[in-house]
Amino acid sequence: MRPDHRMGPPHDEEPHMPETIDAVPEIDDLRREIDELDATIIAAIQRRTEVSKTIGKARMASGGTRLVHSREMKVIERYIDALGPEGKDLAMLLLRLGRGRLGY
């Protein structure tokens, strides 16, 4: 066995690349779509956070609590129903963005 085989193909050989040249433009298009979706999602999260903070301030100004546990549980349930178990983590993050961490 030649020593250079331990480190990969000999230096005069190109590593084998699968034929994916035709897929590159499609991948680029899909990545652009993901970037656009991310921008839309970020804008929606920012707006959701603003609305949630406004609701919290209004509730506290009228003598209520900053949050309503039953409402938060419905939000978490909605995300779990739509996205599966991972939806819980996303819902909790969105709730925290809108009201801040509990106990802090």
Curated annotation (Swiss-Prot):
Marked site positions, Important for catalysis: R59
- Identify the keywords attached in UniProt to this record, alphabetized: Amino-acid biosynthesis, Aromatic amino acid biosynthesis, Cytoplasm, Isomerase
Recorded catalytic activity of this chain's protein: chorismate = prephenate
Q: Report the EC number(s), separated by commas if there are several.
A: 5.4.99.5
Record: residues binding chorismate: R59, V68, E72
Record-annotated disulphide pairs: none
The entry's localization annotation reads: Cytoplasm
Activity control: The formation of the complex with AroG activates the chorismate mutase activity.
Any transmembrane segments, and where?
Answer: none
**Sites marked Important for activation via AroG:** G100, R101, L102
Protein's UniProt keywords contain Amino-acid biosynthesis: yes
What superkingdom heads the lineage? Bacteria
**InterPro entries given in the database record:** Chorismate_II_sf, Chorismate_mutase-related, Chorismate_mutase_highGC-bac, CM_dom_sf, CM_II_prokaryot
Q: What does this protein do?
A: Catalyzes the Claisen rearrangement of chorismate to prephenate. Probably involved in the aromatic amino acid biosynthesis.
Q: How does it assemble?
A: Homodimer. Probably interacts with AroG (MSMEG_4244).
Q: Could you tell me what this protein is called? A: Intracellular chorismate mutase
